[in-house]
Amino acid sequence: MIKIKKGLDLPIAGAPVQTIQDGPAIHHVALLGEEYVGMRPSMLVQEGDQVKKGQALFEDKKNPGVLFTAPASGKISAINRGERRVLQSVVIEVEGDEQIPFEHYAAEELNQLSDEQVQHHLLTSGLWTALRTRPFSKTPVPGSRPRAIFISAMDTQPLAADPQVIIATESEAFNHGLTVLTRLTDGKVHVCHAAGQAVTRHTNTQVTYNEFSGPHPAGLVGTHIHFLEPVSQTKMVWHVGYQDVIAIGKLFTRGELCTDRIVALAGPQVNQPILLRTRLGASLSELTAGKLKEGDNRIISGSVLSGTAFSATHGYLGRFHQQVSVIREGREKELFGWVMPGRDKYSITRTTLGYFFKRKLFAFSTDMHGGERAMVPIGNYERVMPLDILATHLLRDLLAGDTDSAQALGCLELDEEDLALCTFVCPGKYEYGPVLRDILTQIEQEG
């Protein structure tokens, strides 16, 4: 077992009850193009076309053969593009339940499948896009093989669902998915779970189980990779979400594309935080209708630390998100707030009274409590960074754009979510995730 000591479990109110309920009917779903790093789409459909679930919508020009398929049947109601015609979203108005059938196999045949068979099946169904590489967090190139594959069967994000509750409902499909993944690598398939949890073991010795304990980010795949299979420019691993492993298992044994998604709807502004069964790419406005407290709320696809805020073109459940968080918009001004004791304000330093209430849960809002200022190294980053990385030095070099030094300090091991806590505790209010992405893109382009 690997014990994480540094980190932070955000004391936010509105944690979900770990019970699964059916969500409301969803009438609009979408694929969000900007979730796929470096992807350049070649469109295969246009607005007004009727599509079936599993039908290809577009192909990646940079990765020929990588198809992005429809998560539901219906009509293409909108194809939204941003600046320089960057694809933002492809919106489908859900109609019926027609789907593309795929080849399927008996459970005992899965171990005999070739690498080429598995890759072809994942590519044609669109489930290949559930895989991501580390470094760079991109969709893998068809034909490549990773040193290892990681599945995080734990989640320490604030307000997250317990993965074991969800996996328990589809344990057979989950194990079938693990069997399929073993065909894609000569290395280990790492299943990382919380310490003390009872996990059904796979019979294939290629599948290994690793226990992690401690505060967030103990549940992040970046943490697991760092301690088990550190990556570099010459060593690549893949990772995939636990619900996508279930979908892979169902694809190969039933011949159907499963786009179900169980998400935690939680946060201080949710009336009854709970787990909801919905579908991939679901409209967030439809998913949360009638479930939120009145007021000016911010709906976030994903975690409050690293999720994507609701907007007209991005108002849908993200491909890699397992939760929907809702907090209050902090637009109001507080008179002489800087001299108040701050009983209801959380801080990791002794700057507010809230620091001393260790068991108190706070109704966080979007208020930043101050504007951007110079980066001040007072030890906050080191408190929440459990990886063997010089946090302050790395963050400084990211802001300075020093790719050589950032690479030497370990930036290739990181993704945006790995620096979310550093952003949260930063006295200077810097957003380190986008800066990291710019540096990673520059490193990749320069070789």
Swiss-Prot record:
Keyword tags: Ion transport, NAD, Sodium, Sodium transport, Translocase, Transport, Ubiquinone
Assembly and oligomerization: Composed of six subunits; NqrA, NqrB, NqrC, NqrD, NqrE and NqrF.
Lineage, top-rank taxon, reads Bacteria
Q: What does this protein do?
A: NQR complex catalyzes the reduction of ubiquinone-1 to ubiquinol by two successive reactions, coupled with the transport of Na(+) ions from the cytoplasm to the periplasm. NqrA to NqrE are probably involved in the second step, the conversion of ubisemiquinone to ubiquinol.
Which reaction(s) does the protein catalyse, per the Swiss-Prot or TrEMBL entry? a ubiquinone + n Na(+)(in) + NADH + H(+) = a ubiquinol + n Na(+)(out) + NAD(+)
Per the UniProt entry, the disulfide pairs are: none
One family from Pfam that matches here is NQRA_SLBB
**InterPro entries on file:** NqrA (IPR008703), NQRA_2nd (IPR056148), NqrA_C_domain (IPR022615), NQRA_N (IPR056147)
Give the EC class as a word: translocase
Q: Which GO terms describe its molecular function?
A: oxidoreductase activity, acting on NAD(P)H, quinone or similar compound as acceptor
Q: EC no.?
A: 7.2.1.1
Q: What is this protein called?
A: Na(+)-translocating NADH-quinone reductase subunit A
Q: Which family does it belong to?
A: Belongs to the NqrA family.
What is any one GO biological process for this UniProt entry? sodium ion transport
